[in-house]
C-alpha cells in the first residue's frame, strides 16, 4: 500500500517534471551547444519540378497542339548546419565592444533600479503599516502596476515621455533621444512597476512581526530610528535578501522596456544584453554569438547569487 501511494505521488509529479525537462532543461542544453557552434542557414536546391502555367482565371494554358504549357520551378529547402568552433564565440563576445557596453548598461541598470525599489518599498511599507486614513484603498491602488505587462507599461511611458507630443513635452527634456536621459527613463519605468512588488512583500513581513517585540523595544528606547535599525531591519533581512535576488534575476533579463521605449537607442545607450543577443539571434541569425552572450550573463548572475548567499551565511554564523 505504501509503495502504491509513492507511485501515485510520482505519477502526479510526472507532468511537472516533463514540463520542466521539455521547456527548461532541454532548451538550456541546446542553447549551450549552440554557443560552441557557428550556425549557418543555407537554401539548397533539391530538384526541379515542372508545373502548369495558369491564366488569370486559374486554368492551365495550352499550346496550339492542345498540350499544357509548363514551366520549370526549382525546389528549394532550408538547411541548417552546425559547425563546431569551440570557444571562438565566447572570445568574440568578450572582446566585442558592443557587448561590453550592453553589459555595462545592464549592470548599472540593475544596481540603480533594484536599490531604489528596495529603499522605496521599505519606506512605503513602513508608512502604510501604520493606521492612516484610506490605507486600504491606497494599498490596493499601489499594487496595480504589477498586473500590467512590461511591454504595455513601456508603451504607456513612451507616450508620456515622447518629447514631441507627449504630456511632458513642455519641459523640453529629451527623455528618450538623449544618451544621458534615456537610461534613466528606462530605469524610471522599472522602478514605477516593481516598487509596489517590494512594498507588498515588505508590508506582509512587517505585519508578521509580533507586536510584543515592538512594544518591548519601545520600552527600551524611544528612538524610532534605533527601533527600526536594531529590531525591525534585522528581522526583515531574510525577506530583503529574497526580494533583492528576485529583482536582480528579473532585471538582468531587461528587454520589454527597451523594445517599447528606446529600441536600444539613442545609438546603443540603452542596449541591454538581452536586447543585444535577441537582435543577434533573430535579426542577424548569429545564434552562436547570442547563446554565448546569454550564458556569460547567466554565469555572472550565478556568481553574484553565490557570493550573496556566502556573505549572508557568514553574517548569520
Residue spans of the language-model regions?
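A structural signal for multi-pass alpha-helical bundles of membrane permease subunits
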Residues: 2-317
